[in-house]
């Protein structure tokens, strides 16, 4: 398939050919869901913690004698049923990360790209380069292109001026091609690829 290439000023800059093996798949929501769940699980902190009965600061002595009081049998006041006692089966510090095969991760990226193409939400820009690091000027260019919620993917090296100018614009993300991922593609409305990014994707999946 072919897409029109535009400049940041909104002018035509030719066409680019896209591989059907990368951009022409029938999107599968289950694959996308698996990859996004894997990404978010990796990011989750897992610093939650509650003290168990072995960790609370309290005497471990038996509360009162076993027999003769007429009361229920108890040992330590650290037990979970008492105020100030330890939590039974409470949260512990752990990693929420789980494994996902590389083939599924790669397939998820291709399905995310295909989903954006199918929704007509992909724009190819010839070059993501700004002459100066001015947010106002870049925001005006984005408005001309109708980009209010978008992910920009550049080549291996991002233009410093473009990155600086874009980082303060709401709902706009800028990543190098190495950072392209399913979650960021799906969470933004439009996907904007530079010609260098398209070439890198073709090379990666050939």
UniProtKB/Swiss-Prot annotation:
It comes from the Bacteria. SUPFAM superfamilies: Ribosomal protein L4. Residues 64-77 have a biased composition (Basic residues). Residues 63-97 are annotated as: Disordered. One of its GO terms (molecular function) is rRNA binding. Keywords: Ribonucleoprotein, Ribosomal protein, RNA-binding, rRNA-binding. Disulfide bonds: none annotated. GO terms for biological process: translation. Gene3D superfamilies: 3.40.1370.10. One of its GO terms (cellular component) is ribosome. Pfam families: Ribosomal_L4 (PF00573). HAMAP family: Ribosomal_uL4_B (MF_01328_B). Part of the 50S ribosomal subunit. NCBIfam families: rplD_bact. One of the primary rRNA binding proteins, this protein initially binds near the 5'-end of the 23S rRNA. It is important during the early stages of 50S assembly. It makes multiple contacts with different domains of the 23S rRNA in the assembled 50S subunit and ribosome. Belongs to the universal ribosomal protein uL4 family. This is Large ribosomal subunit protein uL4. It comes from Rhizobium etli (strain CIAT 652).
């Amino acid at each position: 398939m072919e897409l029109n290439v535009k400049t940041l000023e909104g002018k035509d800059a030719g066409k680019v050919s896209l591989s059907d093996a990368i951009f022409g798949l029938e999107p599968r929501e289950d694959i996308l869901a698996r990859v996004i769940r894997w990404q978010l699980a990796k990011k989750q902190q897992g610093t939650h913690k509650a003290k168990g009965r072995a960790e609370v600061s309290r005497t471990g002595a038996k509360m009162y004698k076993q027999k003769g009081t007429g009361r229920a049998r108890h040992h330590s006041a650290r037990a979970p049923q008492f105020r100030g006692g330890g939590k039974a089966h409470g949260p512990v510090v752990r990693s929420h990360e789980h494994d996902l095969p590389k083939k599924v991760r790669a397939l998820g990226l291709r399905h995310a790209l295909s989903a954006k193409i199918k929704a007509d939400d992909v724009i190819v820009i010839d070059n993501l380069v700004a002459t100066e690091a001015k947010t106002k000027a870049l925001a005006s260019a984005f408005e001309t292109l109708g980009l209010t919620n978008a992910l920009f993917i550049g080549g291996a090296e991002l233009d410093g001026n473009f990155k600086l100018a874009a980082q303060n614009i709401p709902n706009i993300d800028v990543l190098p091609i190495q950072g392209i991922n399913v979650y960021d593609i799906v969470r933004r409305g439009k996907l904007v690829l530079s010609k260098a990014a398209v070439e890198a994707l073709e090379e990666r999946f050939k």
